[in-house]
Amino acid sequence: RFKNELLLRYIKYKIPRKMTIAKILKAMDLEEMQPFLDEAELTADTLLTKENYEDIVKVFTIHWDIVTEHYRRSNNAAKAYYKAAVGNSKSAVIVDIGWAASGFSALRYLIEDEWKLDCKVRGLVAGSTYLHDMDIIEPQMTNDIITSYMFSQRINREIRRDHDVKRMYGAFTEIMLSAPAPSFIGFDFDDDGRIKYEFDYPEAEGYSMINEIQDGIHDFVNDYTKHFAKYPCMMNICGSDAYAVCRQVISCPEYFSNLFADYPVNRAVGSASFETGSLGKLIENEFVK
């Protein structure tokens, strides 16, 4: 069901990165696809381009059974994990920053449709904006399966229009909400059959900066709740007010860059697939004024 999403995120979105097919397959952990790509004259050292993208997709589509079989073990481990986590619950909420809710949508499909865990899943996202995923998120928002806090096509549309992903606004917001830990990749089983968690390469150079950001968030929350303890209505913060913090950051990219110029940033899915750069260099190269 989410074949197109996988191909978009792991292949199409990487066209500007000037990556080889070998690096793309490594990021996807699908090196066994290389012989089939070789048959189509798409060798390991071939650079991904907009001209050969459809040819690559065609090979993946023809041999999609290889892809699904490769990820079957991870799927089974994920099922075991979420079955234990859900337990006897009849409903659950998944919280994510956004922006297209593709991760939530895939997990909801697995829990409700493929694994049939008898649990209805709802999603909460900070904001909803997207380039290619309207058919995934919009029907779910219309049916109240997904609720967006700060902005979406349904609420605070003026904020959604201003939140330009091409100007790195999404990246700035995600940095503010990052964790001092490697990105989670997926599930697997160890040699004893127990569930284990797999993580991407740690970008440890940024952990101290993340901790500073989170300390600042905690300080603000503590001060806010202290000063308004007698006014519970002040705890009901609307999405547009919450976005004021994001707006302050994205309206001053130079200030943000001065504070976090050395923050490590990987613009591609899978650290093994692309050399990590710095936020300062990224703003210099990609920010559209």
Task: Go through each PLM region and give its residues.
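Long, contiguous domain-sized segments
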Residues: 3-289
